[in-house]
Amino acid sequence: MKNFNRRAFLKAAGATTAGLVTSGLILPASAQPQKMPPKPSNGKSVMGLISPKLSTVRVGFIGVGQRGYGHVKHFCHLEGVEIKAICDTDPAVLDRAIDFVVEQGLAKPNAYTGSEHTYRDMLQRDDIDIAIISTPWQWHAPMAIDTMENDKHAFVEVPLAMSVEECWQIVDTAERTQKNCMMMENVNYGRDELMVLNMVRQGVFGELIHGEAAYIHELRWQMKELESKTGSWRTHWHTKRNGNLYPTHGLGPVSQYMNINRGDRFDYLTSMSSPALGRALYAKREFPADHERNQLNYINGDMSTSLIKTVKGRTIMVQHDTTTPRPYSRHNLIQGTNGVFAGFPNRIALEQSPFERDEKGGESFHRWDMDMTRWYDKYDHPLWQQMGKEAERNGGHGGMDFLMLWRMVYCLRNAEPLDQDVYDGAAWSVVNILSEESVNNRSNSVTFPDFTRGAWKTGKPLGIVGA
């Protein structure tokens, strides 16, 4: 080649590459597909896993301070279960849980306390089938992995894990051990969420195109929990990350509406965070100037907003805000070609409505229908029709907690697949990590790992089941 100027060529090539990146013809590194780790040598998919039937589900609890104590109460009222052991590092809450079990006329569970790793002693018992894990977030993944390694099913509070690596470790362990690992997303068992799932399955909204999910819940008051309870550890996550810290409550139901991991999956997301102002202002107002809460650097944006694109092209907005003064909301919005359902407050607008078309005619989608009575009558989920009164009587966020636990036990006792599997927990939880990565990279898109390793293409959609 004559008259080749290497410096000029490299300069021109660099400019061309930059132009291709900004034009979208070449993806930035953050949007490149993530390398899928190899399948474990002795593992296989747990999609639709059916475990051997358990006539009695023998339970061990790890963590009974707040959520875990509520689970203990519910398990005392479930048929076909035995509470064998309870573990907590706090002797006071451990004794409280054991005393409650005994007060119900049930056998006294064995107690485990001591170090943060004492739970491993409990997991070595051969008379426990499942472990219920309700501990601070950073313990969820290691405890779930240890549970499965000890030949037990793991049921974990949200979120499932706090890193992409932990998500893969949990998936790999589940596939190798062939044990269930379910992240206990209770909101999927709410009456409204179950009704909407039933409506989606019946085609009421047409083809789905968009969803909106959120966890908007003012929790600044937890900053006053200094020595124990949720605020003693959750507050510090606002100083460590800047993204969606808690995505699953809103995202879980919307994912099931859209058959995520069962015919569609998350492809990539982009995220933005607002300024982080509210917690520092609250600390300044509520605590002395030299208080430890005023020495923290709160970096997590008060409002986190993510947009997810699925492989089928659908979009999902996911928000997180536990700081600003505003009413509670999970959004719970699902939009289809025939109309929309939105929550908080519940309302429906359809182009072809089974009610408005007959009564008034014309286009009913220009006005919200906020009277849910007839919608419940027509579309209440069979589970809620059969178990709703018992769920409400036992309580737990309007009955969703009890119904979730009841359904878990039912599936284990009847050799049926669980409603949520390890792939769901990983996909919903990893938004936490990916949103932070996007925020830190000027909101560039970040690709979701395919935790199913392609099994989402043939996964069976969650059915409408009864009791």
From Swiss-Prot:
Cofactor (UniProt): NAD(+)
Enzyme Commission designation: 3.2.1.-
Keyword annotations from UniProtKB, A to Z: Glycosidase, Hydrolase, NAD, Signal
Keyword Nucleotide-binding: no
Similarity remark: Belongs to the Gfo/Idh/MocA family. Glycosyl hydrolase 109 subfamily.
Plastid listed as a keyword: no
Residues engaged in binding NAD(+): Q66, R67, D88, W137, Q138, W139, H140, E157, V158, N186, Y246
Annotated substrate binding sites: Y215, R234, Y246, P247, T248, H249, Y328
Function as written in the Swiss-Prot or TrEMBL entry: Glycosidase.
The protein's enzyme class: hydrolase
Reported modifications of this chain: Predicted to be exported by the Tat system. The position of the signal peptide cleavage has not been experimentally proven.
PROSITE patterns per record: TAT
Organism field: Shewanella woodyi (strain ATCC 51908 / MS32)
Protein name: Glycosyl hydrolase family 109 protein
Leader sequence segment: 1-31
Cofactor notes: Binds 1 NAD(+) per subunit. The NAD(+) cannot dissociate.
Pfam families with a match to the protein in the record: GFO_IDH_MocA (PF01408), Glyco_hydro_109_C (PF21252)
